[in-house]
Amino acid sequence: MLKPKDLCPRAGTRTFLEAMQAGKVHLARFVLDALDRSIIDCRAEQGRTPLMVAVGLPDPAMRSRFVRLLLEQGAAVNLRDERGRTALSLACERGHLDAVQLLVQFSGDPEATDSAGNSPVMWAAACGHGAVLEFLVRSFRRLGLRLDRTNRAGLTALQLAASRGHGTCVQALTGPWGRAAAAAAARGSNSDSPPGHPAPAPSPERRRPSPRRLPRPLLARFARAAGGHGHGHGHGHGHGGELASAGKGSVRYRAQGNERPELGRSMSLALGTMTEEETARLRAGALMARPNSPQSSGSGRWRSQEVLEGAPLALMQAPVGLSPHPEGCPGSGRLGLRRRSTAPDIPSLVGEASGPESGPELENNALPFSVPGPKPWQAGTEAVVLQAQR
């Protein structure tokens, strides 16, 4: 029984080659593992490696198994023997297509020439292996094959095939695949610098565009909006204050100035900056008659409207604003319409206009934001409050 300690590199090489000739794949694998793959590229007769011996095996099944085993274990593909022949050159000479396919898959060179100047393509053309030659030209149709290369006798692969009457080889070399491979090789050779001439200077690279960045005005605008976001709730309560609204397209609004953005009705109510037309429209909506209301008179008009009709002109022209009038508890957040007057003879309507059913809905989208509480009323001041439900 063969043991690993009985093997040396010379004995291991002989045992491995004998296992290949006998078709013993397991024994060959055992020898490679025992010697740590040190004999995988060892030299035998005529300087040939085990891979060169494997491509010449007559049995196709054993040949494929041993060639794949050696290639997967790291055997060198393009090593040469004493005559400069490679494993691919030997496989093309014998016409072993399966071995040629494996060698090309593991980067076998089809243009490696031997001592006579013959390449694997020339060996396949000279020996009449049309299938092998067609596989080579198809595999290298993009990388290119120098089909016009001559050996030391001055013959090309096409001349070698034609001189020996190998029509299939001639057809493979002159067919579309052969022309494509020759054209690709010609393009590659034209791009190379001729001998003795320096390579052309590389063209200057185009300046790469800088990464896309936002314009400076837009960045400054975002910075201002981010800086004013935390101050938008604290300003705008006083009569002469400023309201800074944060967000995209934020603007600064001065209450005492005429230049203000177009605000919605809800925002106008919230800021207390309604125009005279808006105030009149709101007053008309608040005093609209509701016949079924318990607070309406027999004529269908609001009692508050009757009182206002007899009120002095100072009350009718009093400024209209919004205050968080409570519905039973302070700070309920319900926005109401408050009219202030200094006339002592106008009765208070606070008690009559309380409750959720005290008036029509003035605004459906009123803003539920917090506003400061009303100032304490002075002595002798009466108020008329008409609540506007949201």
From Swiss-Prot:
Gene3D superfamilies: Ankyrin repeat-containing domain (1.25.40.20). Transmembrane segments: none annotated. The modification Phosphoserine is found at residues 193, 304. Keywords: ANK repeat, Phosphoprotein, Repeat. SMART domains: ANK. Coiled coil: none annotated. InterPro entries: Ank_Repeat/CDKN_Inhibitor, Ankyrin_rpt, Ankyrin_rpt-contain_sf. Residues 181-213, 226-245, 320-377 are annotated as: Disordered. Pfam families: Ank_2. SUPFAM superfamilies: Ankyrin repeat (SSF48403). ANK repeats lie at residues 11-40, 46-79, 83-112, 116-145, 153-182. This is Ankyrin repeat domain-containing protein 63. It comes from Mus musculus. The lineage of its organism: Eukaryota, Metazoa, Chordata, Craniata, Vertebrata.
